[in-house]
Amino acid sequence: MIQQESRLKVADNTGAKEILCIRVLGGSSRRYAGIGDVIVATVKEAIPGANVKRGDVVKAVVVRTVKERRRADGSYIKFDENAAVIIKNDNDPRGTRIFGPVGRELREKRFMKIVSLAPEVL
């Protein structure tokens, strides 16, 4: 459950380490984002020489949340951290690698490139 001012770890190799959510996309009064939802964020921490810099405003898709999510079969999925992958405007990832597992909800929301790059889909 990600909302404005939430800080997320970046799970790709764009060079950003941490981002801060500034808007949840998908409706004028949408408050929370879960796995597979797109957010607008600003880069708070980045490594030197990266293709994204501190202060850049980026779009990202949430891939892991600490808040559990109930699935259609009755099971729950939750992770140890909140993480996101920085994406381009056409919903393709800006990086070339994804670190850590991602939720199965990304496949249902048509983020196929992220699912194929991820080492594990839970």
Swiss-Prot record:
This is Large ribosomal subunit protein uL14. The gene is rplN. One of its GO terms (cellular component) is cytosolic large ribosomal subunit. Part of the 50S ribosomal subunit. Forms a cluster with proteins L3 and L19. In the 70S ribosome, L14 and L19 interact and together make contacts with the 16S rRNA in bridges B5 and B8. The keyword Cell membrane does not apply. It comes from the Bacteria. It comes from Mycobacterium sp. (strain KMS). One of its GO terms (molecular function) is large ribosomal subunit rRNA binding. Keywords: Ribonucleoprotein, Ribosomal protein, RNA-binding, rRNA-binding. The keyword Ribosomal protein applies. Belongs to the universal ribosomal protein uL14 family.
